[in-house]
């Protein structure tokens, strides 16, 4: 590393040249050198170790949350497979657990359901412990209180946001941040120009929007879309922003995406400026 002028960490998905032709260490090095010379490599951010502890704690909490969801799904699938109605959250609670187990007639099936309940209790205990540890670590960051001031972002979502973004200055604009969070639009267009009476004119054909970008950080997308969903059903300045979009004729699902983009943009701006949330941001900044 003493003789290296610059270290570039690049996205291997975009190095299509490496897939063509023969492959060896020498050939790959030559192709990478050609891509670097032509400025065709796509650099990605390789963060520092300052948030390493929080990142691991967030990953632990997220994994345990996913495990909890899976166990709950298996438990309800067991009841549904025997035509037992199990809507809502009652099948998971300890108060009526014996009543649910008594509805299962087969001894082997009842034993399986009991094992799932034991597994659910154990994972929920671990998840609560992981959550406490994650929140305790996130409180050490000065930006934590600033981001928590944004309505419906909350302690857990703020912890995930800090761990995944690390530093806000890696995103020069909010549109770059939207793309990283899976909130950017993917468009397709062709035949943009045509000849009319010998003159080249731009076609009036509208740009085809395919939807939100697929290559993104899924945790951050869940953070902002979850906050937008909560804000759209509770009173507050964000709900007013959402209602104004509905009044303009925008569909509810598109209005929620717009609200998620707004929350993401505010989080990035407040993080960079070191300021707390002010409802005036909803009026001064364009969505």
Residue ranges: model-predicted function:
Residues 1-105, 233, 254:
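Phosphate- and other anionic-substrate recognition elements at nucleic-acid/protein interfaces
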Residues 36, 58, 113, 161, ...:
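Short alpha-helical scaffolding segments that buttress acidic/His motifs in well-ordered protein cores
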Residues 62, 69, 121-128, 261:
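Generic structural signal for well-ordered, non-transmembrane alpha-helical segments
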Residues 68, 75, 79-82, 86, ...:
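Leucine-rich amphipathic alpha-helices with coiled-coil/heptad-repeat character
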Residues 102-156, 165, 232-235:
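Helix-hairpin-helix/helix-loop-helix acidic hairpins
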Residues 146-149, 155, 159-248, 252:
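Phosphate-backbone recognition surface of nucleic-acid-processing proteins
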Residues 230-287:
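Acidic, carboxylate-rich catalytic segments that either coordinate divalent cations
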């Amino acid at each position: 590393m003493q003789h290296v002028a610059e270290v570039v960490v690049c996205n291997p998905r975009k190095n299509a040249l490496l897939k063509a032709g023969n492959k060896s260490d020498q050939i790959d090095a030559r192709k990478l050198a050609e891509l670097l010379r032509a400025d065709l490599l796509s650099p990605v951010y390789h963060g520092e170790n300052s948030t390493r502890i929080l990142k691991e704690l967030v990953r632990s909490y997220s994994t345990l949350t996913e495990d909890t969801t899976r166990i709950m799904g298996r438990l309800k699938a067991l009841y549904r497979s025997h035509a037992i109605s199990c809507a809502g959250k009652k099948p998971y609670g300890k108060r009526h657990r014996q009543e649910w187990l008594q509805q299962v007639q087969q001894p082997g099936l009842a034993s399986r359901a009991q094992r799932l309940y034991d597994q659910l209790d154990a994972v929920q205990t671990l998840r609560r412990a992981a959550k406490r540890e994650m929140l305790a670590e996130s409180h050490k960051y000065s930006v934590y209180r600033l981001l928590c001031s944004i309505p419906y972002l909350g302690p857990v979502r703020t912890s995930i946001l800090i761990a995944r973004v690390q530093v806000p200055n890696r995103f020069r604009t909010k549109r770059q941040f939207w793309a990283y969070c899976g909130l950017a639009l993917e468009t397709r267009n062709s035949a943009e120009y045509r000849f009319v009476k010998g003159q080249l004119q731009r076609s009036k054909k509208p740009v085809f929007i395919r939807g939100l970008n697929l290559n993104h950080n899924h945790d951050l997308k869940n953070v902002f879309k979850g906050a937008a969903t909560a804000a759209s059903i509770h009173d507050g300045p964000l709900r007013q922003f959402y209602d104004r979009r509905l009044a303009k004729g925008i569909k509810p699902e598109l209005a929620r995406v717009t609200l998620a983009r707004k929350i993401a943009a505010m989080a990035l701006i407040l993080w960079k400026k070191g300021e707390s949330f002010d409802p005036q941001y909803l009026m001064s900044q364009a969505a």
